[in-house]
Amino acid sequence: MTPHEAFAEGRLAEAVALQEAAVADRPDDPAARLFLVELLAFAGELRGAADHLRQIDSDDPNWPASARSFRRLLRAEWRRSFADRRPVVLPGPAPRHARRRWPAIKALRDGRPEDAVRYTDAADAVTPEVSGFVDGRPFDGLRDADDRFASVLEVFFAGRYAWVPFEHLRRVTLRPALGPLDAAYRPARVRLATGDEFDGHVPLVYPGSHEADGVFAVGLETDRVCPDDGPIRCVGGKLLLVGDEGDEVPLAECRMIEVR
């Protein structure tokens, strides 16, 4: 089995081991080392990914810009998954529901699930309902399946980790996936209610999914978990609940979300 085949089947640990062997055999092959960088990012091994990224020497004139983009993605993911920092909220100031979700995440990290439930319940109580279109299909009601992020869209831009409250989003256009890492961080164009627009990446896999089975780590499947009577959390691919019935729509399958 090749590393690409193992990755496609969600066998992430096997794919990493196979690709590490390939890089050991061909240490000067930039494509081989870049694929290892991508696999290590899925596996949550951000430091190792950054180390291998620095070792890539490519004659491609576009490589410096590509390397800079990879570094920014790794930096944003570190801030999302490992740094104890409140995300940027766009546009500011943060609405009450967004301000209450961050303490819930902090409470979960500190082992206080009951406090986390209180925070997410308080956030839900002041979250406005939004309506709009997902790929042209109208909806009334939109939320993330994970209580930690129920009312916000996670976005990476310029190495920063941000939340966009759904009521402050006007449109997000997810571009087609061109490489393996696009399955985790999809290039996107974001338009805010203020009229401001920017290019960034939308994470398609929940933070911490690298600790689960391979199919979840690479976003092929999603599972909702509540191991400690805390808020509902998800592992695997990002999942939206759309409309009054809460229809499950994988974010990776969306091309455009518009909010009225």
Q: What positions do the PLM features span?
A:
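Short coil turns that delineate tetratricopeptide repeat
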Residues: 27, 61-62, 128
